[in-house]
Amino acid sequence: MKRGYIIITIISLLVFMSCNNSNNNRTYPEGEINFTIVETTDIHGMIFPYNFITDKEENTSMAQVSTYIKKLKDEGKTVLLLDNGDSLQGQPTVYYYNFVATNEPHIWSEVLNYMNYDAVGVGNHDVEAGHNVYDKIVKEIKAPLLSANLVDEKTKNPYFKPYTIIEKNGVKIAILSLIEPAIDRQLPKVLYEGLATEDMVESAKKWIKTIKEKESPDIVIGLFHAGANYTEDKETFKNENASQLVAEQVDGFDIILVGHDHQGWSGLGYDETTKQKTKEVKSPSGKVVPIFGGVNAARFIPSIDVSMIYTNNAWDIKFKGELIDVSKYEADKEFLDNFDSSKKAIQTWVSRDIGNLNTKLTSDDAMFGDSYFLSFIHKLEFTIAKEELGEDVDVSFAAPLSKDAVLNNGVVRVRDMFSLYPYENFFYVMKLTGKQIKDVMEYSYDRWFNTMTNINDHLIAFKKDANGELIFNNRYNSYDTVTPSYNYESVGGINYIVDVTKPRGEKVTIESFTDGRPFELDKEYKVAINSYRGSGGGGHLSQGAGIDLKTLQNMDLVLKATDKDLRYYIIDWFEKQNGAITVEKLNNWKVVPEDYVEAGKKKDYKLIYPNN
C-alpha cells in the first residue's frame, strides 16, 4: 500500500474559448485557492468501529472518518467530502435499515447528513438493495445522489442526477459520477426495474461535453464506482472496471476518484505490463490525470490537497494526495453518541438466537472439494425451493461466497447468517438443459482448479504475472486466484467426478443424479440458483453455457423467484427447526487423482491461508 505523498501538477488546457456569455463576464478568484478532497468508498455498512457479524471491535469506521474530517476543518481547511457508493450492503448495520426498520430514516442517510457530505455516488451494491431502499435514500440525504450512466430504459435519461456543480472558495467544481455497468449481468432485474446501464467511456464522452458547454467549470472530478484495472480486454463493452480507461480515452477530467475494487489508489494507475500501481495515467491530449481511490470499510481514504491559481486565462492545478490510514484516528465520540440508539437496536436484532448447530462449518474446506459447508448450502437450497416456491428441483448450484466463513457449533444467531451468506442474493428456480448444466460445471472447474501435469503442480488456479510468477495480494495476505471463491460453483443433486489432469472442457464426468436417475444432456431440468449467478454473474451461464445475456436479464429461463433475499429464508429455516442441527456431507462429488489433489491442497492451502 502506497502511503507516501505523490505530487502531480496539471496545467489546465481549458482556455474557455467556447465559454458562454455569463462565464465571459465572470470574475475569477485571485491568488492561490486551496481545498481538500476526501473520498470514502465501499463502506459496506461499516458505520461503527464494531463488527456486528463477528461481535468484535474494529479500528476503522465512519466514526474514525468523522474524526479525520473534523481535524481538517479545525486546521482551517475547506473540505470537499465525497462518497463513491457501495454503502448499502455488507454489515447488518445497513441490512437492518434496508429490510427490517423500514419505517425509520435510514442510518446511512443520517450519517451522510450528519457529516455534511457534498455529493454521493451510486454503487452496484446500492442498487442491489432495491428500488424501495435507494428511492428512499435519495429523498432523505441532503447531498445529491449521482450516477450518469444508470438510465431510464425508455427515455435514456439518468435516473439520478448525472453530475453536480459545487463551489468551494470561489472555484466552480464539476463532479461527474458513473457506476460500473455490469450490474445487468450481476443483479436480478427486479432490483433495478425500468433502468439500464450505459458503457462508462461512452457516457463520459457525452456528459463531459455537456458539462463543459453548459457549466464551464474550473475543475472536473470523476467520481466513478468502478475499479482502475480493467481486468478484461480494454475494448470490452460495459467493462466493469473502466475508470482508468475513461481517463485514457476521454479528455476533460482533472482527477478521477475510483471505488468498487477495494484496492486503494494513491495517484498512479495500473500498469498492465508490470501488474503494479505504477502508471502515470494520461488523457488523449497528454494531460496527466491522477487516480485516487479508497480501501473498503473505511480502512484507507484518499485525502487530496488541491491548489489552483488562475493565470493567463487558464487554471494551474496541483494535487498533493495520500491514502490516510483511518485506524490511526480515534472514533468520534460525538458521532457515536449521536447514533448510539441505532447501534443498540441493531445489536439487539443480530444477537437474537435462531437455532443450534452440532456441526462446525468452515468455508476453507470448500475451496478444495466437497465439504460440510457447501453440503449445507445445497440442502438449504433444495429445501427453500420446495417449501417457499413449491418446486422439486433436480440440481442446485452453490459456491463459498467467502473463503473465510466460519459458523461455529452451538447457538446460532442472526449475525452468523451474514458469515454463512454475506450477500443479498435472491433465489431462483431456473430451467436448464443437461448440456447447459454440464457446460456451467466445466466453466467453473476450469477457473477453479489448475490443469495439473504432475503431482508437484498447483491444485488451485492462481493468477500469474508477466513472468509467470504467482501474484501476492498484500491486502488479503494471500495469493490471487484466477477467479474469486464466490465463483467456485459446485453442484448438488448429481454424482460427478472432477479430474484436474484433464484439459479445459473435459474435467467433469457426470455419473447420474444422486437418486439414481440418468443424467441426460438434451433434457431440461429444474435448477436452484442464486440471483447473482442466474443473472449472468461470473459468466457461468453466459460464457460457460452460452446463454444470451439478455435472456438472463429478462429472466426468461426463471420459473419462480423469491421476493426476499436468501438470507431471510435461511434465518426463517433455522427458526423452524426443532433441536440441534447435524450437517451431513453430501459426498456426491470428488476431485481426482486423489494423490495429486492431496499434494496440491497441502501446498496451496498455505498460499490461500498463510496465517492458518
PLM segments and residue spans:
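Short secondary-structure capping/junction motifs at helix and strand boundaries
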Residues: 2, 145-146, 392
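Sec-dependent signal peptide recognition
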Residues: 2-10
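Residue-level detector of alpha-helical recognition elements and their boundaries
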Residues: 8, 135, 271, 452-456, ...
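Intrinsically disordered, low-complexity regions enriched in Ser/Pro/Gly/Gln/His and often acidic
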Residues: 9-12, 582
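C-terminal motif of bacterial Sec signal peptides marking the signal peptidase cleavage site
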Residues: 15-18
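Acidic, metal/ion-coordinating pockets
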Residues: 20-324, 328, 373, 377-380, ...
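Catalytic centers of hydrolytic enzymes
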Residues: 26-36, 45-55, 59-74, 186-201, ...
